[in-house]
Amino acid sequence: MNLWAMGRMTLMVALLVVTTAWPARATDRDKLLTDPGVYGTFAAFQMDHDWWDLPGDARVIAVSEAKKLIEQFSSQLVIESYLLRGLSDHADFMIRVHAHALSDTQQFLTSLLGTRFGRHLVATSYLHGLTKKAAYVPGFPDQMKKELQSPSEVPAKSYAIVIPIRKDADWWALDQDTRLALMQEHTQAALPYLNVVKRKLYHSSGLDDFDFITYFETEKLEEFHSLIRALEQVKEYRHNRRFGHPTLLGTVRPLDDILELFAR
């Protein structure tokens, strides 16, 4: 191998080992992930065909630039990533962003699309929602509240699923007590899966074409399948005017791993 080739390989390796930093303080990250009033965005992308025609070193340089940008924004945002390629025909990868202001997410995504890597991204889905305090849980029986607070037994989960939902007009016309009873039945059906399927809800009315974005993580897709079948059998499900379309399925992966995969 000549000196020029060795130097080029050294540069490529050095660029690839740049790591992406997450929020500097764990407490800030925890608050963004758990507090109400936080905006969540799911941005799904495909790589365009021109990306794969680039020489390897050009892809490495482009990926390195994207990593540095993500590091710059990681002090104010929580940025999580998922590999969809091979499991979903909607996108190659997805980013979930939590921010106190949706404009901060917009600034990050706009900056990302302006990088050499971002110019090869084709956005396939943008889903926006807001975290809120539980509307129905305070009215549940004490035993159900206690069960909902049980910690998950499986901390590491490999798969993520995003399902947007739109309710019909009849749902919003129901009085609070009727909706409470329906959601209690919904929750009772979901309780057996609490320890194997992690869930997070985002409210999207007015922010998107949906009313809710449901986010799931699990190690066992068969348990997730059983959960959905159980929820399809409760009365509340009949008020779902739209369930999915798109449904995004992927694996939870560090963004460094995803970017390096696309740099090869």
Feature roles, as predicted:
Residues I70-D92, G118-K133, Q188-I213, L227, ...:
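Short, glycine- and small/hydrophobic-rich beta-strand elements in well-ordered beta-sheets
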Residues T10-T20:
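Bacterial N-terminal signal peptides
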Residues Q107-T115, S226-E232:
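Short amphipathic alpha-helices in soluble, non-transmembrane regions
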Residues M1-L11:
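Bacterial N-terminal signal peptides that target proteins for export
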Residues R25-S74, H100-T105, L127-P192, S205, ...:
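Short S/T/G/P-rich N-terminal loop/turn motif that feeds into the first structured element of a domain
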Residues G86-L87, D104, F117-R119, S152-V154:
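Short, charge-rich binding segments
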